[in-house]
């Protein structure tokens, strides 16, 4: 996804860049494990979180000034690789 330069992730994690309130918050909802990984509804749960963030409806886990959200979801397996992958990017626009 290009969130940081190769080899730089450890430094960025230690600096808190990906934490809520950081420069590039990642997974403010706690992710799918925090939701019990609702198999079959995983993609919908991710999309709901993105839309709620862009609408400013996330309370304590709200990313301040959220303008763009991205979700990646994979499922099914062919050997050891995912059989299908989707990437969803949503952006807040003015009506």
What are these language model-derived features?
Residues 1-95:
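Claisen-condensing/thiolase-fold acyl-transfer catalytic domains that form or cleave C-C bonds
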């Amino acid at each position: 996804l290009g969130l940081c330069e190769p080899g730089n992730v450890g430094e960025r994690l230690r600096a808190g860049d990906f934490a809520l309130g950081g420069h590039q918050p990642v997974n403010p909802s706690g992710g799918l494990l925090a939701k019990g990984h609702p198999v079959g509804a995983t993609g919908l749960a991710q999309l709901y979180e993105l839309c709620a963030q862009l609408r400013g409806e996330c309370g304590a886990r709200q990313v301040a000034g959220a303008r763009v959200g991205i979700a990646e979801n994979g499922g099914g397996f062919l050997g050891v690789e995912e059989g299908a992958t989707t990437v969803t990017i949503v952006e807040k626009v003015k009506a």
